[in-house]
Regions:
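Hydrophobic "anchor" residues on beta-strands that sit immediately upstream
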Residues: 90, 132, 150
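C-lobe/activation-segment region of protein kinase-like
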Residues: 151-242
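Conserved protein kinase catalytic/activation segment
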Residues: 141-152
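Conserved ATP-binding subdomain of kinase catalytic cores across diverse folds
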Residues: 2-98, 129
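Short acidic, glycine/proline-rich loop/turn micro-motifs
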Residues: 35-41, 103-107, 162-165
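Soluble, non-transmembrane catalytic domains of enzymes that act on hydrophobic metabolites at membranes
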Residues: 1, 55, 128, 145-146, ...
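Short, glycine/acidic-enriched loop or turn micro-motifs at the edges of active sites
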Residues: 97, 139, 157
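Conserved kinase catalytic-core helix
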Residues: 59-70, 103-135, 139-140
Length: 242
């Protein structure tokens, strides 16, 4: 069992194994004393971020409060070690029955690529319109129904405040979407054309030079969580080749 059993990995996620339920559960094993103490006390790290468990809980709750297209938050829980500290953290959301993630859809049906890209860009815009910046929005974090609008998952790396560097932030988001596996299924030129159309439609006033500076790097280089934070907060990015 995902809840009762000993996890085989640090993070495990799966539909809850119950015929009567339609829930999805994530379990994280807290692997250090500092992390257990922070989560138990609800404290942030020195850099201002929370551990994954709390980040996703807080962000999912706030996204739902704003009416964002994300799964319903059902609840959360934890187990304790013999010392009384939090050992495992559980997050339970509504299972998106009838949905498939965008990466799986493209992998199984490459001719669906254009639809996946369009739906993902529309979702990105919807989140921005609600003041939500999802900094890990790749195809597998876009859940697509047979009919209707997409939903976003994995909300742990999000911002809910305005940025002074919207162009740079968008440059990362669009570039990252290409870098994280989509490049395998579309030429860079074709993807660039779809991004250009999306900018005209959704973000016509964005500064194109500032956008392009980050976009060209994000398409080809891995950018970690803290560097993404720098982009959002300061518009700062440097290529590894600089």
């Amino acid at each position: 069992m995902l809840i009762d059993g000993k996890p085989t990995a640090k993070r495990v996620s799966a539909p809850l194994g119950c015929d009567e339920s339609a829930y999805f559960i994530k379990r994280e094993r807290l692997d250090s004393l500092k992390k257990k103490w922070r989560v138990q006390r609800g404290r942030a790290k020195r850099n201002g971020t929370y551990d994954w468990s709390l980040e996703e809980l807080l962000n999912t709750r706030e996204a739902r409060r704003r009416g964002a297209p994300v799964p319903d938050l059902v609840g959360y829980g934890y187990s304790r070690s013999k010392l009384g500290l939090v050992q495992d953290f559980f997050l339970i959301t509504r299972l998106l029955t009838g949905h498939v993630d965008g990466f799986k859809k493209v992998r199984n049906a490459p001719d669906s690529l254009e639809r996946v890209i369009r739906a993902s860009f529309e979702l990105l815009h919807t989140l921005h319109s609600l003041g939500i910046t999802h900094m890990d929005l790749w195809a597998a974090n876009v859940m697509l129904p047979e009919q209707g609008s997409a939903q976003a998952i994995d909300m742990e790396n999000c911002f809910f405040t305005p940025t002074d560097y919207l162009a740079e932030t968008l440059g990362f988001q669009f570039g990252f979407f290409y870098f994280r596996e989509i490049y395998r299924y579309v030429t860079e030129a074709a993807y660039d054309a779809q991004v250009a159309q999306a900018l005209v439609r959704y973000f016509p006033d964005v500064d194109r030079d500032s956008f392009a500076r980050v976009y060209e790097i994000a398409k080809h280089e891995e950018i970690g969580r803290m560097k993404r934070r720098e982009i959002f907060q300061n518009g700062a990015i440097a290529s590894r080749w600089d």
